[in-house]
Every structure is written in C-alpha cells, then in structure tokens.
Design a protein with these regions (language model features):
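Alpha-helical transmembrane segments and their cytosolic interface
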Residues: 1, 5, 17, 150, ...
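Hydrophobic transmembrane alpha-helices
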Residues: 1-75, 82
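Hydrophobic alpha-helical transmembrane segments
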Residues: 7-11, 33-34, 63, 88, ...
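Small-residue-rich segments of transmembrane alpha-helices in multi-pass membrane proteins
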Residues: 36-48, 91-103, 177-179
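Transmembrane alpha-helix boundary signature
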Residues: 45-56, 78, 100-113
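Membrane-interface alpha-helices at helix entry/exit sites of multi-pass transporters
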Residues: 82-90, 163-170
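Transmembrane alpha-helix/helix-exit interface in multi-pass inner-membrane proteins
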Residues: 89, 93-112, 138-146
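Membrane-interface interhelical connector segments
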Residues: 104-129
C-alpha cells in the first residue's frame, strides 16, 4: 500500500492519544498511571524498529512516547503538580524495572532445543549506554515538563487573573521545550562518538520535527480530558 507507514504513523497519534483519554474516562487517575507504564515499556521496544516514512529512515517509539507528555499534562491540569510528578516517578520506575527484567533473561542458559533465545537477545540486548541515555532523558524532560506546565500556569493566572484559560499555552509551552530537551539529551548521550555529527544533526532535526507535530496535536486531547473531568467529578474525587 502506498504511504502505508505514513498512514499508520498518523493514525497511531490519534489511537494513542485517544487511548490515553479513554483510560482516564474509564479508570480515572489510575488509568493515567497505567497508560504511563504501558507507553514507557512499549516505547523501549518500538525504538528498536527502523522504518522509512516521509522520505527518511526513523525509529518508532516517538509517537507513543509523546503520549507520556500528554499523560503528565492531563495529570497536571486535573490533579495537580504532586500527582503529575508521581506519574513521572511511576514511569521512571517502570523503565528501570523493564530494563532489569529484560536484561536478566540473558543470564539463563538456553536449552539445546530452544529457538527463541537468539531472537530475543537480538531484540532486547541494547547497549547499556543507550538504555541509560533513554532513562536519563526521560527523567529530565518529564520532570521539566511538569515544572514548566505549572510555571506557565502560575504566570498566566497572575498576568490575566484567570486560572482556567490559556490551557493551550501551558500545554504547548511546556511540552515543546521538554521534547527539545529529550531529543538533544538522548541523542547526544546515546550517539555522540558513534555517528558523525552531521548524522546526529539530522536525527535531532527530524526527531524534534515529529515531536513538534505530536505536541501540537495533543492539545485538543487535554481539553477533552478536562471536559470529561468536569462532567464526571467522581473521576477526580477518587
């Protein structure tokens, strides 16, 4: 099918963002925590897959990882800074747990008739440098995202005297900068000295381009989540 990868990537944005909001609608705060764990683990696996889309080769994982920023922004908007930071800590712990479990598989000696140990090792035997770079970048950019969201919120409320308005500004103002930090920190820590600097530059530009699009596209979903919370106050009182 022509443009199959492009179609799937665009559709996945709506699927992942919509899925997160659905988790919130049916399970409240716990649904957002659960989604954070799911997207953290899935992104670690997806990032190993290289696809050709929009004229360039790129790794998967960017879109579902972007939904983790939507999760913290929804948590900030509805439940506050403390719960948003808790969401980030759950994501960090899920990341560490997945890395430790997946690496422990390689301590076993496969049976003579085993046919899966080799492929599994190929998939999950990431270099420690890449795994640590991913974990560090996630922790830094997500914590910054929560801080920036509430910094923007405090500024707009003080300047305009309205706490409810300018959701779009605090959402995009925090996420766009956080995603830039994520792209720069991860790629420099993971690939400096591995790839030529011009290649790293291309990865940075294309990766951040994807995050700009997903960051702008997630704004309606924050509004939708807030609307759901207003119509269903029991989700907030849990």
């Amino acid at each position: 099918m022509p443009f199959q990868n492009e179609i799937i990537l665009v559709a996945s944005v709506f699927a992942f963002f919509g899925g997160l909001v659905a988790f919130f609608r049916f399970f409240g705060k716990q649904g957002i925590f659960t989604w954070t764990v799911i997207c953290t683990i899935a992104a670690n696996i997806e990032v190993l897959i290289l696809v050709h889309a929009f004229g360039l080769d790129t790794t998967l994982g960017n879109v579902i990882f972007a939904s983790s920023f939507l999760a913290t922004d929804i948590m900030s908007e509805i439940f506050g800074k403390k719960e948003a930071n808790r969401c980030v800590k759950i994501g960090i712990l899920a990341n560490i747990t997945f890395i430790l479990i997946s690496q422990s598989w390689f301590l076993y000696i496969p049976a003579d008739g085993d046919t899966m140990a080799g492929p599994i090792r190929t998939v999950f035997a990431n270099t420690p440098r890449v795994m640590l770079a991913s974990l560090f970048a996630y922790a830094v950019c997500e914590m910054f995202d929560v801080w920036a969201y509430h910094a923007w919120w405090k500024w707009t409320e003080k300047k305009f005297g309205d706490k409810r308005k300018f959701l779009w500004l605090r959402n995009n103002g925090s996420t766009l900068v956080s995603q830039l930090i994520n792209v720069v920190v991860f790629n420099l820590l993971a690939f400096a000295g591995v790839f030529p600097w011009n290649t790293i530059g291309e990865i940075l530009i294309f990766g951040y381009g994807i995050f700009i699009v997903t960051s702008l596209m997630d704004t309606p979903f924050v509004y939708l989540a807030r609307r759901i919370a207003e119509k269903h106050p029991e989700l907030v009182k849990e």
